[in-house]
Design a protein with these regions (language model features):
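C-terminal lobe and adjacent flexible extensions of AdoMet/dcAdoMet transferase-like proteins
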Residues: 209, 228-287
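Catalytic cores of RNA-modifying enzymes
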Residues: 1-225, 229, 260, 271, ...
Length: 287
C-alpha cells in the first residue's frame, strides 16, 4: 500500500535517512495524495504497462505506479536517494527496478528493447524545472517507443507546450510538442503540494504520442532548425530571422520566394505560422 504523499510521512523518511535536499537536482517532493492520484489517472496506467519514472525522489509517486502498472523502471540521479528507495519505500514491491543514472545519459531505446521487447511504454515524472525541456525533447528526438508522457512541469512551460499560433506562449517548444504529440493539461498544481515549496505554480501535462507526425517533411532536423531560427528573435520578421541564422545558409531572396509561393507576406513573423505552414516552408527551402 502507498504510504507516502503526505507531509508527515515524507518528513519521517527524510529524517530517518538524514536526507538533505540538493538544489542542483531541483528536488521538490509531492505531498498531496489527490495530485498523485490525478497523475496516475491522467497517465492512464494499466496492469499491461511498463512505466519509466524519471526522478522518483523518495518513491512517493513510484508506490502509486507500482500498484497500478505491470512494471516500473525508476531512474534517479541522486545516489543519496537510492538506499531510501531500495531498502525502505519500495522494498515491498517486486515489480520495480531502480537505476542510479542521469536520464540524459541513459540509452533508453536499448532499455525498452531489453525490458519490453521494444513495445511502447509510458513515461511519468515530476521533473526538475531547470531541465524539463532537454528531457522531453530528448525523449522525442531519440524516438523511444512511447505511448504517452505525463509530467509535472512549471505551469508556464505547460502553457507553452499547449499554445497555438498567435498567442504569447507560442514558440519553438509548442511546435516541437505538437509535431510529436497531442498535449493536454490535466491539472494545475499549487506550490503547497510540494516539499520544499517551489517558487512557481505547476501543472500536470499529458503528451500523447502520434503514431506518425501530423506533417511530412523532407528533413526533420532542418524543420526544427528553421523553427528555432524563427523564434530566436521573436520581434523580427521571418525573412530576417531565417537569413540571420548561419546554420540555415539561406538568402533573403530564397525565403521571400518561398513565402510568396505559400501566399504569405514578406513581413510575416514566425509566431503567425502553424506547424503545417512551417512544414511547407521547410520543404520549399530544404536543399
Amino acid at each position: 500500500m502507498a504510504t507516502l504523499g503526505n507531509p508527515q510521512n515524507t518528513i519521517e523518511i527524510l529524517k530517518k535517512y538524514d536526507f538533505m535536499f540538493q538544489k542542483r537536482f531541483g528536488q521538490n517532493f509531492l505531498i498531496d495524495t489527490h495530485v498523485l492520484e490525478k497523475i496516475i489517472k491522467s497517465a492512464e496506467i494499466t496492469k499491461e504497462d511498463l512505466v519509466l519514472e524519471i526522478g522518483p525522489g523518495i518513491g512517493t509517486m513510484t508506490q502509486y505506479l507500482c500498484e497500478n502498472a505491470r512494471e516500473v523502471i525508476a531512474v534517479e540521479i541522486d545516489k543519496n536517494l537510492i538506499p531510501i528507495l531500495e531498502k525502505d519505500t519500495l522494498a515491498q514491491y517486486d515489480n520495480v527496478t531502480v537505476i542510479n543514472e542521469d536520464i540524459l545519459k541513459l540509452d533508453l531505446n536499448a532499455l525498452v528493447q531489453e525490458r519490453n521487447g521494444g513495445k511502447r511504454i509510458k513515461v511519468v515524472a515530476n521533473l526538475p524545472y531547470y531541465i524539463t525541456t532537454p528531457i522531453i525533447m530528448g525523449l522525442f528526438e531519440s524516438h523511444v517507443p512511447l505511448k504517452n508522457i505525463t509530467v509535472m512541469v512549471q505551469k508556464e512551460v505547460a502553457d507553452r507546450m499547449q499554445a497555438g499560433p498567435g498567442s504569447k506562449d507560442y514558440g519553438a517548444l509548442s511546435l516541437a510538442v505538437h509535431y510529436y504529440a497531442t498535449p493536454y493539461i490535466a491539472a494545475n498544481v499549487p506550490q503547497n503540494c510540494f516539499m520544499p515549496r517551489p517558487n512557481v505554480g505547476s501543472a500536470v501535462i499529458r503528451l500523447t504520442l502520434h503514431e506518425e507526425p501530423p506533417v511530412k517533411v523532407k528533413d526533420e532536423s532542418f524543420l526544427f532548425a528553421l523553427i528555432r531560427a524563427s523564434f530566436n528573435q521573436r520581434r523580427k520578421t521571418l525573412v530576417n530571422g531565417l537569413t540571420n541564422a548561419a546554420e540555415l545558409a539561406l538568402s533573403k531572396e530564397e525565403v521571400q520566394t518561398a513565402l510568396e509561393e505559400m501566399g504569405l507576406s514578406a513581413t510575416v513573423r514566425g509566431e503567425a505560422l502553424t506547424l503545417e505552414q512551417f512544414a511547407e516552408l521547410s520543404n520549399l527551402l530544404a536543399k
